[in-house]
Each structure stands twice: as C-alpha cells, then as structure tokens.
C-alpha cells in the first residue's frame, strides 16, 4: 500500500481539490469568453464609432464592413428616412429611429445607439457596455447571468465530486471496521487483512484484528474449560454416587430386618439425606450441562403448548408441596423463541424454590406471564417472607447461601441455573419484593 496520511490531511486534500477546481473553472470561463468573442458570438464592452468618410459608399460597402463587428445596426436613407438595410431586432427599431432623428448618440441604460452619417446614408449602431450574445434568440439571456450560472453549477459539481470521493473513502474504511466488528471473537482466518491509507482508520483496523484474535482465543479457552468442568463434575458425581448407591442398598437391607422405632427413625433420616444428596448432584450435573450446552436457543415455541406441558409438572409439584397454585396469563402472544427444555427446567427450579419458602399453613404460589415490546416475562410469586437485600443481589450465584432468611436451608444452584438459562435467552433473572407482600422471581427472556 502507498503512503499513508492522517484524516485531517485527507480533509484538507479535499478542500485543496475544490480550490484548484475553482481556479480552473474561472480560467475555463475566461477562455470560453475569449473564444466566443473571437468567433463573434458575444459583443465586447468597448465603444466604436463607424466613420462614413466617402459619399461614394454604397449599402453593400457598409454591410460588408459591418460583418466585422458583432453589433446590430440600421442603415437609413437621409432623404426619406427609410430603412435600407441592417441587422436588428424589431423591438429596438424605435431607439434606432430616435437616434437618427436627433442626429446624435442616445443612451438607454447600458445600451448606446451611436449615430454616423454622410451625404446619402445614416448608420446607427447598437452597442452594449456589457457583453451580450449577438444571436437574437440567446440575447434574452444575460451573458453575465450565463457566466454566474455556469460558475455556480460547475462549483456545485466540483464540490459534489470532491465530497463524494471523500465520503466514499471514509465509507470504505467504515465498512472494513464493520466487517471485522461483526466477526469479532469468531475463529476465522481473514484472507487478507485490510489496510487503510488513513492512519486513524488503519490503527483501528489493526487493533480490531488483534483484539478479535485474542477474544477468539479466550472464547475457545473458556469453551475447553467448560468441557473440562462438565467432565470433572460428571466424574465426581459418578465417584460419589457409587458409594451412595451402596449405602442405599445397605439401608434397604436394614429395612428388611427387625428394627426398633429409634433405628427406623435413623434409617428414614439416612434415606432423606440420600435423596437430598442425589438431588444435589443431579442439579450440579444439570448446571454444568447448561454451561456446556450448544443447543439452539432460537427455536419457535408455541406459548399455549409450552404452558400446558409446564402446568402438568407444576401442578404435580404443587400437590407434593401442598401449595395453592395459580396460573395467570396476561399476554396475547402466541409464539416466542427459545429452548423449551432449558426454559421449563429453569421455571420448575424457581417454582420449587417458591413452594419451599411459601407461608406455612397457607402456601400460595402463582405463575404470571406477560410481555412488552421486546421481552416475555415469567413471574413466579409466593406469599412467604421477602428476599433479604443480600439474597436479591447474590441469589443467582452458584453455591450462594446465607445464615438466615430464605437461603438458610439450601444452596443457590437452582436460581443460578435459572439465571444461566435467562442469559442464554438474552434476558435476566430479577428478584424483588412486591408491595402486596411475599417475594417474586421474574425470568425475563427476549421474544
């Protein structure tokens, strides 16, 4: 690539192009004027006086001499004052006649009628102090106005041409920036790294290419880390589940023997603990699978079918937890985009959390669905204690717990999973305490 230059210099180059073009345009106008005068298409501004020295001049002699001058004229007979010849416009005849009758020059504005005579003839010349077209048809257009219009149009074309090339060059550079920006972070090999003659754009392009490669490397490294994490959690789950399975079998064997009431309580407690552990590791596996999930999150989903399938599971859970469950649909939306499996699992996790912390004795949990121009909202509310400020800020984090309040009995894997699903759907998880009391979790996704 040739020599590079700054953006300021490129703009000044465009300005200089316009200035040089303007000077050339002026020279063109001067040359055009000189050429038209040479071929007799416009009259000059100088005043001439025709001399009729000889009384032997004929009309033909006068007409032959007048062909050398770009002026209108009329030849009068001195005896009869009749027009014997000439080159003129009928509308100017009264002025010619007035000059003949007065035997003097007369001036009307910028036009002078010059009187000359001998014994037989009188000649009146029409001369304009300003250049004008000698062609009677074109004379209605002022030559000065013609030059102004010519200069104005030429200047506009010149400016448009110069600005167009400037904008075109800038546009080409912006398109190069857009091209790399749209592929930022993708692992791709550019056939040829684009360069710019403008220093500022070239620096931006080089920086974007460099950052794109770095980002692609980091994304790929993170993807490998997620694969490793998924494998490690799966291996850990298998390693832990094996002794738990053995322990579960031993407990079942103990149940088959004769045990007293206290021993039966111990066995029941161990079974509950095993169930908690099993659920805990299953949730961990689900969370790591979500991190490593490459499934499509843009599938078209029927909202009605989705709610029907979801309600079946939520109603079963509400029966298990002895909760008064309500479904409230506040939208006319028919379809949306997302991943059915991930979304239903996230809502079930939130629903279970709401059931566990609803008000004892009269548990109420509701699921409300509504939307706006960009997002679809799934709002799950219960009538339990409100979230603490710490929980509202951190409940979506993995392994979050606090000593008191809503998170005192569990870890935040369920809500962390829901937060991950929301982010996959270009949304967010919102925890709030409404004015009507209780607590609510809103899963917001892009429609």
Curated annotation (Swiss-Prot):
Its EC number is 2.7.13.3. One of its GO terms (cellular component) is plasma membrane. It comes from the Bacteria. GO terms for molecular function: ATP binding; phosphoprotein phosphatase activity; phosphorelay sensor kinase activity. Residues 235-447 form the Histidine kinase domain. CDD domains: HATPase_SpaK_NisK-like, HisKA. GO terms for biological process: cellular response to phosphate starvation. It is an enzyme of class 2 (transferase). PANTHER family: PHOSPHATE REGULON SENSOR PROTEIN PHOR. Member of the two-component regulatory system NisK/NisR involved in the regulation of the biosynthesis of lantibiotic nisin. NisK may function as a membrane-associated protein kinase that phosphorylates NisR in response to environmental signals. This is Nisin biosynthesis sensor protein NisK. The gene is nisK.
């Amino acid at each position: 690539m040739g020599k590079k230059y700054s953006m300021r210099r490129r703009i000044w180059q465009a300005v200089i192009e316009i200035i040089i073009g303007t000077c050339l345009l002026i020279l063109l106008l001067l040359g055009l004027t000189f050429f038209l005068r040479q071929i007799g298409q416009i009259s000059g501004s100088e005043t001439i006086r025709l001399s009729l020295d000889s009384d032997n001049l004929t009309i033909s002699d006068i007409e032959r001499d007048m062909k050398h001058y770009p002026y209108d004229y009329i030849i009068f007979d001195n005896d009869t004052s009749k027009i014997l010849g000439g080159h003129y416009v009928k509308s100017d005849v009264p002025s010619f006649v007035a000059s003949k009758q007065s035997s003097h020059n007369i001036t009307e504005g910028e036009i002078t009628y010059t009187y000359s005579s001998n014994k037989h003839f009188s000649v009146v010349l029409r001369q304009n102090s300003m250049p004008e077209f000698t062609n009677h048809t074109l004379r209605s257009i002022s030559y000065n106005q013609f030059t102004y219009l010519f200069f104005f149009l030429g200047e506009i074309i010149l400016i448009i041409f110069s600005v167009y090339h400037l904008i075109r060059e800038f546009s080409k550079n912006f398109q190069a920036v857009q091209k790399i920006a749209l592929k930022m972070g993708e692992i791709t090999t550019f056939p040829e790294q684009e360069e710019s003659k403008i220093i500022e754009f070239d620096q931006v392009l080089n920086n974007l290419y460099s950052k794109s490669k770095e980002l692609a490397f980091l994304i790929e490294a993170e993807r490998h880390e997620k694969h490793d994490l998924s494998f490690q959690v799966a291996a850990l789950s298998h390693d832990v589940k094996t002794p738990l399975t053995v322990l579960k079998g031993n407990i079942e064997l103990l149940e088959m023997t004769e045990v007293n009431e206290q021993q039966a309580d111990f066995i029941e407690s161990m079974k509950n603990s095993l169930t908690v552990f099993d659920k805990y590791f299953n949730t961990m596996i689900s969370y790591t699978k979500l991190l490593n999930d490459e499934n499509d999150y843009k599938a078209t989903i029927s909202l009605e079918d989705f709610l029907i399938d979801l309600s079946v599971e939520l109603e079963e859970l509400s029966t298990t937890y002895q909760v008064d469950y309500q479904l409230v649909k506040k939208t006319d939306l028919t379809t949306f985009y997302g991943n059915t499996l991930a979304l239903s699992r996230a809502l079930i996790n939130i629903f279970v959390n709401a059931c566990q912390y609803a008000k004892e004795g009269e548990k109420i949990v509701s699921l409300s669905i509504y939307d706006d121009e960009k997002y679809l909202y799934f709002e799950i509310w219960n009538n339990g204690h409100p979230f603490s400020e710490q929980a509202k800020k951190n409940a979506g984090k993995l392994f979050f717990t606090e000593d008191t309040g809503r998170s005192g009995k569990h870890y935040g894997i369920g809500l962390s999973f829901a937060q991950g699903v929301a982010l996959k759907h270009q949304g967010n998880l919102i925890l709030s305490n409404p004015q009507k009391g209780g607590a609510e979790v809103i899963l917001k996704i892009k429609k």
